[in-house]
A protein has these predicted regions:
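Conserved SAM-binding loop
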Residues: 169-170
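Conserved SAM/SAH-binding beta-strand->alpha-helix loop
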Residues: 162
Length: 266
């Protein structure tokens, strides 16, 4: 997790440097009213970046002192998808989508439908008394947690190749207080913002308290190899149900991978 923390903090530092460079351009504006407005906006952006840095400290720990900041990102991977999902913007936006009230309102119906389909599948195939459900590409863990809550008799395994996403998932699942963190998910995205305030938008996470869930839930979060659904140590454990969302582009042959881990009657 140290390498991930270092990379994410560096990306946040790079964003801060870019905003500071914008401040230098603002200072050269001749129009006093516009300059004052842009100066206030720039200061608000810097404050939000610093607030996000504090959230990174909470999620991943502080960066080593020698790593702050640099314009060269150290996170190098041979897997394109790992690069994407370990990125700072991806971490913030997945966190907002899955664990804020505003984001989850758009996912609630989909997650409920997937959970219902899993339940129906388990009933119709009459698996063992302790069925196993695999959720590859689980990201920040919201769907995996909801499935585990809805099916306490099942063993739920969420996997993701991104250590950054799993770091968020583990922290969210341990939270016992809703709204314990506030994030600004769109600071690095200056496009598609109709107003100054939309880029500065702050969202409270999580919207629920997963850490207060019943202790009898069986939920594991694991990191497989980049081309696998499950770690090699768990490959022999075939699954009764494989359920995934936003994952079809992450494996060379998704169907073959699903067949390899699916139970014969699953």
């Amino acid at each position: 997790m140290g390498a991930v923390a270092r990379a994410l903090h560096r990306q946040n530092g790079w964003l801060r440097q870019n905003i500071e460079l914008e401040a230098q351009s603002i200072a050269s504006l001749s129009a006093g009213q516009l300059r004052a407005r842009m100066t206030r906006y720039n200061a608000a952006l810097l404050a939000a970046v610093d607030a996000n840095a504090s959230v990174l400290d909470t999620l991943y720990g502080p960066p080593p002192s020698w790593s702050w900041p640099t314009l060269t990102l150290p996170w190098q991977s041979t897997d394109r998808n790992v690069d994407i999902y370990n990125g700072l913007g991806s971490v913030w936006r997945h966190l907002a989508k899955d664990w804020s009230a505003e984001g989850h309102s758009g996912m609630r119906d989909l997650n409920a439908r997937l959970t219902s389909m899993i339940s129906d599948e388990l009933r119709s195939n009459a698996p063992s008394s302790s069925p196993t459900v695999l959720l590859p590409g689980c990201g920040t863990g919201r769907l995996a947690w909801e499935v585990a809550c809805a099916l306490p008799e099942a063993s739920v395994i969420g996997t993701d190749v991104s250590e950054a996403q799993l770091g968020v998932a583990r922290h969210m699942l341990a939270c016992t207080e809703p709204g314990s963190l506030t994030v600004h998910p769109w600071l690095d995205e200056s496009r598609n913002n109709a107003t100054d305030q939309s880029r500065l938008a702050a969202l409270a996470v999580p919207d629920v308290a997963p850490g207060a869930a019943p202790a009898n839930l069986s939920l594991q979060l694991v990191q497989p190899g980049a081309a696998r659904l499950v770690p090699a140590s768990a490959a022999a454990q075939q699954m009764d149900v494989v359920c995934t969302c936003f994952f079809l582009d992450c494996l060379p042959d998704t169907l073959a991978a699903v067949r390899a881990v699916r139970h014969a009657r699953g």
